[in-house]
Amino acid sequence: MFTLGIICWLFDRTLDLIEKRIAKVFTGKKEALAAPNILALNAGYNFADTIEAFSSRYTVSKVNLPPGEYRRITGNEATALGFLTASQLSKLPLFYASYPITPASDILHELSKLRHFGVKTVQAEDEISAIGMAIGAAYGGSLGLTGTSGPGVALKAEAIGLAVMAELPVVIANVQRGGPSTGLPTKTEQSDLLQVVYGRNGECPVIVVAPATPGECFDMAIEAFRLAIKYMTPVFFLSDGYLANGSEPWRIPDPDKLPTFEVTFPTGENGFIQPYSRDAETQARPWIIPGKAGLEHQIGGLEKENITGKVSYDQENHELMTRLRVDKVAGAVQSIPDMSVHGDEKGDLLVLGWGGTLGAIRHAVDNARSKGFSVSCAHLRYLNPFPGNLGDVLTNFEQVLVPELNLGQLLMMIRAKYLVGAIGLNKVQGQPFRTSEVENKIYEMLDKPVRKVAGA
């Protein structure tokens, strides 16, 4: 408390709110502890005020946030709450299996505290067991979920292909870290993008979503399950170590305003349903859980015959089914929102990012715009498929800059798909971007004589 008092003086903060908090925490049998803690807090404040050892004080202006009830939340905490909320909204039990791995382990820790909501968690003996359990849970009608980091994704790859072939709604949370191999377990990176989009044998498409802030982890965790169920396909939730361990003030949502998503299982009461028949809108197959009389069907990793789901080695059927799976994932674009542009919708330069780079990018763009530069930014939350308007957004700007904590993986994808001459700003040091790094690159690309920015 003494140290906290010093910090409050340094940052020009009054003590009244902290004193009220202390009084609230130390109630009942602990009430006697409140007074000495408040005294220690004030002693630290007065010590800093009188010792004349500090040459500077700092004033942090009050943040401008919408009204509501807020709490501090980390990315992994928000991720766990988001997956729990998806369970509540869908009225399906959540099953989470994972092998401990930094920086994803906190998701297991948080979900294991939520058993009173019906959450089931398993600390598996290895990565392959964890994804196998999640697939089995999805097959049985639960929300099947597993979590890991890049090395674990490599081990899970074959089983993820099984989920694609069986067309089951499994969600895989990948909290990225520095790689390859063991790499930098406690440092952040964005080097798993190509791995999660393409890293399996065969034509093996999956949906990929990525939060941009710790608080957004909550929303995108729900979105991952919404898309997985709607399209009956595996979905990657792609976070990173910076988001996982970073925190921010998070407005607690009103549960009554969260959109529900209905889940129905065929019962066989209306006759036999072909296991690989397709929904006209989404091309998803029905979610048939085992134990329903009359709905028995084959399941597994061998190619399935269209409609019937029987094992098939027919060459034309294989191409048909391959294209159906690819088109189904590509068609998910109709269920994701268009991306928005921060700033003008046309101009000299667009800074395009994804994941935890949002803060540095937006601050850099705002700084440049305040100096009169024609620059805007956009941030991707959907990485496969891309938002439907991404191509139009890119062509509205003379130049495109793509900052990434890798050696240009999103850059490669948008160059290939949209044929734009984008430029990368790449960093693989285990650290997030500084605002100054992005800002100086903006001035360099706009070829303007601006003094180089230093600092954060």
Could you describe each region identified by the protein language model?
Residues 1-26, 408-409, 433:
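Short alpha-helices
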Residues 17-206, 210-211, 428, 436-439, ...:
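Thiamine diphosphate
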Residues 21-24, 36-39, 43, 219, ...:
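A non-catalytic, amphipathic alpha-helix used as a structural packing/dimerization or gating element
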Residues 4-7, 151-152, 176-178, 356-357, ...:
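Short glycine-rich anion-binding loops that position phosphate/pyrophosphate groups of nucleotides
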Residues 105-107, 156, 181-182, 219, ...:
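Short helix/loop capping segments that flank catalytic or ligand/cofactor-binding pockets
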Residues 3-5, 94-97, 144-147, 207-210, ...:
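Short glycine-rich or small-residue beta-strand-to-loop segments that form or flank ligand, phosphate
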Residues 73-82, 90, 220, 225-456:
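Flexible, low-complexity linker and terminal segments
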